[in-house]
Amino acid sequence: MKRSLSVFLAILVIAAAAVAADEGRFFTYPTIHNDRIVFTYESDLWSVDAKGGVAARLTTFPGTENFAKLSPDGKWLAFTATYDGAPAVYVMPSEGGAPVRLTYNPGGAQVVAWTPDGSEIVFRSMFENVVGRDPNLFSVGVKGGAPVRLPLDRGVLVSFVPEKHQFLFCRRGNEEYYWKRYKGGQYQDIWLYDAVAKTYTPVTDYVGKNSYPMWAGGLMYFVSDRGNGISNLYTQKLGTKDAAPVTKYGDFDVMFPHTDGRSIVYVQDGRIHVLDVASGADTRISVKDPSDRWALRDRVINPKDYIQTAGVADGGQAAVLAARGDVFRVPTGHGPAENLSGTPGTREMYPALSPDGKTVAF
């Protein structure tokens, strides 16, 4: 009887813990290695089993951590953080621990990939970019050192094809542009670099989004909005131009995909999916996050910390300010500020005070 009661209480405790954690959504930048996924949520890094479950927070620093990438052996986690101002590359044990900063270059740094042997981290940066707005790709040792530029004129994404001494890369654009059906001069295309032949070969010819190249299972996987205009996963054999759809979403885009060569993890409709490369099985996993939801709490905010534009008139006796979507009239001497708009559901900006101080245009 006592044993049955103990088992019942244990099950009750586990069930209560599962209920206490809400299923999260709007995750970004997931990375996968075998049975572990790390992602960004509430500007921190979290870890969860690849089959889903309760996530564990890995970082708590007030700055933002994103662009995480698990190392090829799964022991290390590289990511971008804004701990000391400009975004920089950091590395820490994948189980959690003290981050170590690896880059100090101007122009920021966003982690893109690991080299296949796990000795270096590839990142993109405006460092050394004299003309233009496209970043370059660099590598830095896992123990630090001077960054080394990859043999490209420019680049934003990369995926290695180690068995052929090649890598796939995107030369331009930003994969985070959410312009639908964009076909302008900054659309992303995918190229192949051969380190032996020193050649650069275009892989895609679709005028539109060709992004996130990934090498897995002897094929190139990538994201494209060809077809219905929604970004989906596609596969393509190198040496051909024939792309086959893997996912066929018609509502929300496939975003932030990453592969460890066996599985592809991505976000769609704010939720995490895992695609098994060998079988083609695609599963949306349930991620419960035990967050305290601190960002959703009601709190008192001083608008002076959010002043954006200002105007002065009435002989310098008064000023109008725009802060957090409202317009305020503030005396330049003593006296209280007055919220002239007070519309929490509408944003007002660029206020201008009339010469007599009686009317405000915005």
Task: Describe every region a protein language model picked out.
Residues 27, 154, 302-311:
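Signature of short aromatic-glycine-proline-rich micro-motifs recurring in repeat-based ectodomains
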